[in-house]
């Protein structure tokens, strides 16, 4: 009995050792429970109780062998040849299932799916985070490149009133007018220039809405004249002789006249432009009323008084120079007519031809 049982025990042990060595997979250790020792758990058949015994410690191995041996209890072991024949003779399907490659590849293949998805998800999240970082960096660079916005200037009612008055007088004020406005309104000159640009744009927009194309053309011509210091065309000046309202460019002439009046007030009115435009027509005087006529008469009186004062100053200067020069000036004045008479006598003699001289002789 003991020999046969030893052969039966030794045979599956050798087979399991050969299978474990041929498969290349190490023997897996199990617990110390009775079910695990007897192989009653739900693990695959590869975890044979004999293979589990090989992985046990020496003390536990002796105890397990004493239990499994045929002389363990009354000469008959718990596991005899007829007790559990499945542990001694393995069927073909158990041998196929006992292959370590087939056993271990399935869980690895199953686990590879979630691992791949987790890797792709992590890579996608990294790509999204990197793209977000790039976008944030580009947005920061764009904000740095942008210029800082200047605060809008808030004009007071007094400043707006003065600016509107100046705009009604001339849409293109020169440097002198802008400096005077800066002194009045206590604003910088560049702010005044920007205000005039915006006001001109607003005026053009309003005129376009009303459909005044001729006025817009005159406005563009006036702006070019002011920028490039171009005089008024002669055709416009000739048409102004009949009257500003009857001319081909009434708005342009009115603006030009306003600029001339502003220059006259500042004392920089050119003499050529004074004679270029005629005085105001009767129609304009009637439209403006008695107040405008009184203002014009006052301006004329002022100009006349200035001219009279200049004439008196010139007369006084000539008198002073005459008194300072004294008798020298008188001698020069007496010498001049004598020289003129001598020249008159010499001139006909020079002009006479020889036959005329013979006739005279």
Swiss-Prot record:
Residues 266-290 have a biased composition (Basic and acidic residues). Signal peptide: none annotated. Abundantly expressed in retinal neuroblasts during eye development and in the inner nuclear layer of the adult retina. Within this layer, expression is stronger in the outer margin where bipolar cells predominate. InterPro entries: CVC (IPR023339), HD (IPR001356), Homeobox_CS (IPR017970), Homeodomain-like_sf (IPR009057), OAR_dom (IPR003654), VSX_homeobox_regulators (IPR052294). One of its GO terms (cellular component) is cytoplasm. It is linked to Microphthalmia, isolated, 2: A disorder of eye formation, ranging from small size of a single eye to complete bilateral absence of ocular tissues. Ocular abnormalities like opacities of the cornea and lens, scaring of the retina and choroid, and other abnormalities may also be present. Belongs to the paired homeobox family. This is Visual system homeobox 2.
